[in-house]
Amino acid sequence: MSLFDDNPGPREEVGDSQDLADASESPSADALSPLASDPISCVAIHPGAAHPLASHLPEDLRITWSWPHLLLFVVYAVVSQFAIGIAVLAYYSTNGHLSQRQIRRLFESDPRLIVGTNVLWFGLIILFLYVTLSVLPCLPFWRSLGWKRLDANPLTGKGRPWMYFLSGSGLSLFVIGASSRVKNAEHVPIQEMFKSRSGAMLLLCMAVLVAPMVEETVFRGYLYPVFAGIASRLAQSFGMDSPSAIRAGVVTSILVTGALFGLMHAPQLGWTWGLVGLLILVGIIFTFARAWTGTVFASFLLHLGYNSMLAFLTVLGTKGFTYMPPHR
């Protein structure tokens, strides 16, 4: 399974000449219609009933899933996170003989537990997407979720990969400067992780090695195109022509996906709305890069540069994890 599979395997051949004729008359239908082997996609888009908007959609928005799969994904994400919490609670209650209050404190302050449960949850989410979007319909996983090569073209404003990485690093410096003006920004829950050397190291490893790929796959690879498609169809239902409806859908999805990205981090920030607002802005910028370039790789590089700069400054500020912030 290649990260940049620009030559996906052939789709299932159509059985009779009439179907072949129909496919030739409507080339976009093949790109959007689900395969019979994927029951989730079959519920999402009925075969042979391609939406009139389909022929106008850019290639990176032609996906095999729609709102039914999105609903199933949300349910799965919530249930899996709840199941992980129940499993941890049962383990510590039985083997650790801890009270619920002590366990709750562990969830808030134990870096190994916090990072471990988050990585496990990320893994379960990627597994769900892999099975339902790649294994069942026999499609390339990464390409289906928008991971394609980044074609640099200065004439169209699409830079080289290192430009996105450095832009993400610069964005993190802006956010750090803006955060310094937010009241009580230093008392948010995530700061608890930086009171110990192990906590800071685990968090930064996850932030650089895990979070950019997983979060970009979910937000910019999975959520962005489905929200854009739904919003485009809704806009067209209100009388917009197809190109205008698609533009409206893309803008709406950029804003919605960015807002969800910021809100997902809100508990870590103690729902400090100044900080949450900055993360929403960051999410919007990441999604705009994905929409502009047509590939998740661009937003991934922004995200990687952003988190890498934060990690570098943390290592610098703690003198290589030899000086940790005092407990308050």
Feature-to-residue mapping (PLM):
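Residue-level signature of transmembrane alpha-helical entry/exit and packing/kink sites
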Residues: W65-F73, D110, I114-N118, F122, ...
